[in-house]
């Protein structure tokens, strides 16, 4: 092969390569034009579907293209980290943040609330102290000497221990036992048992509760019957007066109010006027029945007189026509 042939072959290959490159460029341009046409068609279709009110607003909302590489990198890093974290129990929670100004305002409100509560507590303490001082008494070793105001323990309320003369609460052992009086000598004050309330045993001269056996027996007077003639104390039925041969008043049984002797216990010396009088003794004279025809039926006392009637007149006389 000669040099001329080689040159011809080289030119032919170069021509083929150029033709191929030209065809490739032509295809690329055609593809780009097709993509542009498709994009325009899609945009036109989207524009047609967009309402007329938004078509004028969308161009105004379109901003400048963000081409800051630093901001893009930070956004990608933030997007890679999730805002939700997992605690020890495996539950997800979202972190919440508060502004520093809001936090300071919240702390200020809490401070004001605590100050108001402290003032209220101080006022209550002052009122309680004044109340204790007004009631009297005191706690030993207090700020005012222990003689007034303050809390008083049980031993200091009065009467506890047997050596105090103040009133107040006294336990059962100190109110008064068989010694009759507790811490006051045994003769007054304190709780007194039944045997000490008075009149029990027949040898005491005080009043109070006396059992049935001590209120008064046949001796007529209980603990006062021996030296006072049986007047005091409970008196049984036989001793209330008028029973038997006694001249005092009071309750008298039926047998003693007045019998046929006309006067009861006072009939013997008063002519039968006192006491209960039976029917036969209410009028003097004879009790014979007298008919209505008797002329003296209205004049003589002791006779039978019918009940007065208004139609006959108060003279209560019958006429011959009746």
Curated annotation (Swiss-Prot):
Residues 1-94, 125-322 are annotated as: Disordered. Residues 64-75 have a biased composition (Acidic residues). Residues 14-31 have a biased composition (Low complexity). Residues 141-227, 235-269, 277-295, 308-322 have a biased composition (Basic and acidic residues). Residues 1-13, 32-50 have a biased composition (Polar residues). Signal peptide: none annotated. Coiled coil: none annotated. This is Uncharacterized protein DR_0269. It comes from Deinococcus radiodurans (strain ATCC 13939 / DSM 20539 / JCM 16871 / CCUG 27074 / LMG 4051 / NBRC 15346 / NCIMB 9279 / VKM B-1422 / R1).
């Amino acid at each position: 092969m000669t040099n001329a042939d080689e040159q011809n072959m080289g030119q032919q290959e170069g021509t083929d390569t150029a033709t191929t490159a030209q065809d490739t460029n032509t295809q690329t341009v055609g593809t780009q034009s097709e993509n542009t046409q498709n994009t325009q068609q899609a945009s036109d279709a989207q524009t047609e579907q967009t309402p007329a009110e938004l078509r004028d607003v969308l161009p105004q909302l379109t901003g400048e293209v963000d081409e800051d590489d630093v901001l893009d990198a930070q956004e990608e890093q933030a997007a890679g980290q999730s805002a939700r974290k997992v605690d020890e129990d495996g539950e997800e929670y979202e972190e919440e943040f508060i502004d520093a100004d809001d936090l300071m305002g919240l702390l200020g409100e809490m401070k004001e609330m605590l100050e108001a509560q402290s003032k209220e507590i101080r006022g209550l303490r002052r009122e309680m102290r004044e109340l204790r001082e007004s009631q009297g008494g005191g706690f030993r070793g207090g700020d005012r000497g222990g003689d007034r105001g303050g809390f008083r323990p049980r031993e200091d309320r009065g009467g506890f221990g047997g050596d105090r003369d103040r009133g107040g609460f006294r336990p059962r052992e100190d109110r008064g036992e068989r010694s009759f009086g507790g811490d006051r000598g045994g003769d007054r004050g304190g709780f007194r048992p039944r045997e000490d309330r008075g009149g029990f045993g027949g040898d005491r001269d005080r009043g109070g509760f006396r059992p049935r056996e001590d209120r008064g027996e046949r001796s007529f007077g209980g603990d006062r019957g021996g030296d006072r003639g049986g007047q005091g104390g409970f008196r049984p039925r036989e001793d209330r007066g008028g029973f038997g041969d006694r001249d005092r008043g009071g309750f008298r049984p039926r047998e003693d109010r007045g019998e046929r002797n006309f006067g009861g216990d006072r009939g013997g010396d008063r002519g039968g006027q006192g006491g209960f009088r039976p029917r036969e003794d209410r009028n003097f004279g004879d009790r014979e029945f007298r008919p209505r025809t008797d002329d003296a039926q209205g004049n003589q006392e002791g006779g039978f007189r019918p009940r007065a009637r208004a139609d006959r007149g108060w003279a209560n006389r019958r006429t011959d026509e009746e």
